[in-house]
Amino acid sequence: MLKRWILTLFVVCLGFSQVAKAELELVITEGIDSARPIGIVPFKWHGEGKLPQDISAIISSDLQRSGKFSPIPTNKMPQTPYKDSDINYEAWTKMGVDAIVTGEVKLNAQGKYEVTYKLIDVVRGQLTKGQSKALDESGKLVLTRDHILVNKVASLSTKQLRKYAHRISDVVYEKLTGERGAFLTRIAYVVVNDKAQYPYQLRIADYDGYNERLVLKSKQPIMSPAWSPDGKKLAYVSFENRKSQIFIMNIYTGKRELIASYPRHNGAPRFSHDGDKLAIVLSKSGSLQIYVVDLKTKKMSQITRGRANNTEPFWAPDNKSLIFTSDRGGKPQIYRVNLGDGSTKRLTWQGSQNLGGQITPDGKYIVMVNRSETGFNLAKQDLETGAVQVLTKTLLDESPSIAPNGGMVIYSSIYRKQNVLSMVSIDGRFKARLPATNGRVRAPAWSPFL
């Protein structure tokens, strides 16, 4: 058995895997005219040649993808200041901009990149002319410069530059919206290339498709990757032994644990938000039913029963209930089951089918695949009012996965007859596509905060 595993499947530890620059290239397909204007001024480079990473471009792209910001193109900026004293506040506010990011990069004595950046409130700067004052602890009137919202310096290696740019995006996003940014997160997904020696590959990349790493490759299908809450493990379904099995793998060491290998179907793993339990779907007794495995004791509890098929479990934020897809009413719809008393309630009513549901981190909405006269598209349902909003116009949407801050959704769709990954903001106003260069891409899973 072990020999066959080794011949069939390679587990590749991330530290030694091949890294691609951007196997998934994000292409914006629909922007937002009404998003908040912001100025991301090109960072000044005090050195020879070009910087290994265009920090300001990365920040600008991050904020634009959030759907909440509309970065001003460099050629339309009234100026490109690098110091606070150089800022013409009025010129920026006339454009409707209320905040800008400026920065500088230089090499320090240790050969590292010293990155300095500021987030500046240009409205406050215009009002105070950058000279606001207040009393300090001793009662002395001092210059506060409170229009500078963030002022930070970091010393970085070449490999750290792109990651730090995402960190800046997170800081700016949270400071201006009050919500945590999700730009330092990853996505896991399955790439299928029928012509490859190992057609099925489980990969991980930064949320924007960069720094892709191969985690696992197989001659048999890999399905349904799901992140653990600590971002260190993936649960997934493998057919490496000519039958479906559920594994949990540490993405850093490659160590695996077999969780389920029952007769017939083993699928749809999903970690609870505390990481203690794993919801899975088995058909060992006939129809598809949902079970919960305690990962410490390995005790398994059956959650659903009956003749209907019940699948695609997803945990509520409080871990006290699950939503799932069931055909008990004739066609797939989404239900909620209380894990305490087993009571079940149907949640979706609009559309002939609703499936693949996930609950937003704040517990207010379900994001799901909704079937209507126009096809299969992503939709969002308000759990309090029941109101449904269709978010996408792409073809044959499936496998939605919500960013940990609830601001974006990644999913699989069809583009030019190929499975590709797409993104949509939670309000449906911003859309982007991440076409792969080497195969069909399916089953995306957005990581937790890292």
From Swiss-Prot:
Any single GO CC term annotated in Swiss-Prot or TrEMBL for this entry: periplasmic space
Signal peptide boundaries: 1-22
GO biological process: cell division; protein import
Gene3D superfamilies: TolB, C-terminal domain, TolB, N-terminal domain
InterPro entries xref list: 6-blade_b-propeller_TolB-like (IPR011042), PD40 (IPR011659), Tol-Pal_TolB (IPR014167), TolB_N (IPR007195)
Locations listed in the record: Periplasm
Superkingdom of origin organism: Bacteria
Entry keywords, A to Z: Cell cycle, Cell division, Periplasm, Signal
Task performed by this protein: Part of the Tol-Pal system, which plays a role in outer membrane invagination during cell division and is important for maintaining outer membrane integrity.
PANTHER family linked to this entry: PROTEIN TOLB, PROTEIN TOLB HOMOLOG
Record text on subunit structure and interactions: The Tol-Pal system is composed of five core proteins: the inner membrane proteins TolA, TolQ and TolR, the periplasmic protein TolB and the outer membrane protein Pal. They form a network linking the inner and outer membranes and the peptidoglycan layer.
Listed NCBIfam families: propeller_TolB
HAMAP family tied to this protein: TolB
UniProt record similarity statement: Belongs to the TolB family.
Protein name: Tol-Pal system protein TolB
Species assigned in the record: Aliivibrio fischeri (strain MJ11)
Gene designation: tolB
